[in-house]
Amino acid sequence: MAKKQIDSRTERRVSAQPRLHQRARELQAYGTVNHALPLDLEEPVRVQVTNQLNQLLADTMTLRDLYKKCHWQVAGPTFYQLHLLFDKHYGEQNELVDSIAERIQLLGGVSLAMAADVAETTQIERPPRGREEVSVQLSRLIDAHQIIIQQTRPLARRAAELGDDGTNDLVISEVLRTNELQVWFLSEHLVDVPLVEARERSAAAAGAS
């Protein structure tokens, strides 16, 4: 039997050298979805949901990074507990970032990823580069949470109306509940209660008792 001739021009050479500096066209443009995913969700539905999820993703990534800034820069008598709390909340927000981004990809969309794109998209106010007082840090974080929470219920309702139960579950069970709990922990630090000595009651209050 004659040996098969190998055309050296078409034979792919194996090399241990890395192929560096490669570029190519995008596989998929941002704002689009894959056409033929067997998810039982129409393409217009997935486009609408992924667009809203990307807004939620941008704001969640911004809040996550704001927590890390506060974790590093916090100062004052409550440094220790807030330093730890901010880092705990950062970790929880980071998990939400991953869940939201993967939901976008699962639906056939393209998730935001780069800091510059997130900065252009987020609705959360950009803080200064320097350090701020604890009360201002807490207020900024709560304001950012509020922006996210205001998105969650309408997004969850709309997802349910469109038959996207997976997104509805993610937004309510993970995003909303995590943000609500974190707001509670932050807000209690802004209650003006003495640490060491109770305030004296007014004369009127003392007489009434």
Sequence positions of predicted segments:
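Acidic/histidine-rich alpha-helical segments that form the ligand environment
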Residues: D98, E102, A116-E174
